[in-house]
Amino acid sequence: MKKLFLILATALTVVSCHTGKQAGKPMPGADRDRHGCIASAGYTWSKVRKDCVRTFEEGIRLVPAHVKTSVAAYVIFSPDQERAEVFLPGQKKHPVLKRKGGIWKKKQYVLAKNKNGWILKTGGTDVYVSPQK
């Protein structure tokens, strides 16, 4: 009788240890990229800051110049203001523009500041601008 009770108690202990977690379901914060940034918390890697950043908190927000949409682009500057990293919606790679006088450039991208705020141009066309108040 004691052996039967011991076997039942052991079996009950083993069964109760099953946590019921679903296999393959990621835990919160488990979606770190190769730099350790947690995408689900809004972090992405910035080349110019060499750190995980939340573009919507630390960056300059730019809205589409000619299209009425809520999809914004963000610009983050290096600490010395010599480089500007542009975070465009839907793009995994972020171009890094280098300062040349009062503008930042790389290939077709030009970032400049005027009396109304910031303007990001592509191929000479205004694509993103500072939101108007």
Where are these regions (language model features)?
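C-terminal partner/receptor-binding element of secreted or periplasmic proteins
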Residues: 31, 111-133
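Bacterial lipoprotein signal-peptidase II cleavage site
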Residues: 18-25
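Positively charged n-region of N-terminal signal peptides that target proteins for export
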Residues: 1-4
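Disulfide-braced loops of extracellular cysteine-rich modules
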Residues: 36-40
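Mature extracytoplasmic domains of secretory-pathway proteins
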Residues: 55-100
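Extracellular, cysteine-rich, disulfide-stabilized repeat modules with beta-strand cores
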Residues: 43-46
